[in-house]
């Protein structure tokens, strides 16, 4: 692997950690387009598996810092929503092998564009203190996260960019809890999807070093960059204004969607 590629991947790790810690999205929205650009010879499924592994490693780093900050969540909700996400992820994973790269890229682009518009137009809601979430609200969350997992499984974006706006719409979830919920669900939901990718047979020449269903060398380099950035990201997270954070998230999602669309349908 060229030094320039390693440098780019380190920068990707830094950016991945920032968007994961500050916005609650896993970084898959960054990694999928970047990996498609750096390694165009790899199948989209291998890129998705590599992206998911990076997302899980970054989420684990963030959770260690969240634990030190003593941010509490409802673990019953987290488990129920994670199970729903896993179901959606597995369905999406199986469907991804029946879709062409163009269709997967189209789903990726449309999903991110819709989320960007919704996030940008969404007004700040009044924070309601709810200690016991109603069964209806929990069911609403489960259905939403199953759908989010479906899109994540098809596209390999990790689910955080989809889950973060959905978690924020649920009553009883505080703003500072959103990133904690999504990071937990990205790890749990990603495990099943990653297992499927690693045990699935691929018909391609794995010529890159560190390649086994996913590229472990890429994962290691990006995770290293993510770890180096983690402390600064948590400090920056505490300084960011919620309104500004939401607007920036919308802009990031839209720019990535536009880039992926141009990469696939203009230059491909």
From Swiss-Prot:
It is a multi-pass membrane protein. Its main location: membrane. It comes from Haemophilus influenzae (strain ATCC 51907 / DSM 11121 / KW20 / Rd). It comes from the Bacteria. GO terms for cellular component: plasma membrane. Belongs to the 4-toluene sulfonate uptake permease (TSUP) (TC 2.A.102) family. It is found in: Cell membrane. The chain crosses the membrane at residues 6-26, 46-66, 79-99, 101-121, 147-167, 178-198, 212-232, 248-268. Pfam families: TauE (PF01925). The keyword ATP-binding does not apply. Keywords: Cell membrane, Membrane, Transmembrane, Transmembrane helix, Transport. The keyword Transmembrane helix applies. This is Probable membrane transporter protein HI_0806.
């Amino acid at each position: 692997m060229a030094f320039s590629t390693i440098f780019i991947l380190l920068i990707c790790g830094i950016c991945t950690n920032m968007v994961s810690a500050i916005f609650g999205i896993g970084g898959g929205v960054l990694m999928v387009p970047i990996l498609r650009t750096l390694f165009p010879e790899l199948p989209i499924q291998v890129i998705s598996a590599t992206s998911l592994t990076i997302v899980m490693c970054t989420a684990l780093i963030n959770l260690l810092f969240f634990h030190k900050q003593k941010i509490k969540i409802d673990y019953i909700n987290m488990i129920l929503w994670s199970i729903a996400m896993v179901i959606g992820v597995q369905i999406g994973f199986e469907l991804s092998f029946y879709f062409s790269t163009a269709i997967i890229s189209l789903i990726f682009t449309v999903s991110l564009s819709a989320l960007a518009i919704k996030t940008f137009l969404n007004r700040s809601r009044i924070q309601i203190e709810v200690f016991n979430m109603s069964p209806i609200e929990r069911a609403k969350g489960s259905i939403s996260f199953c759908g989010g997992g479906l899109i994540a499984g098809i596209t390999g974006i990790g689910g955080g960019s989809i889950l973060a706006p959905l978690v924020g719409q649920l009553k009883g979830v505080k703003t500072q809890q959103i990133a904690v919920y999504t990071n937990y669900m990205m790890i749990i939901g990603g495990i099943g999807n990653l297992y499927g990718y690693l045990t699935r047979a691929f018909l391609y020449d794995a010529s890159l070093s560190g390649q086994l269903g996913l590229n472990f060398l890429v994962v290691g380099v990006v995770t290293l960059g993510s770890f180096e950035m983690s402390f600064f990201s948590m400090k920056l997270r505490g300084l960011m204004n919620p309104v500004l954070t939401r607007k920036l998230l919308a802009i990031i999602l839209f720019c990535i969607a536009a880039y992926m669309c141009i990469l696939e349908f203009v230059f491909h």
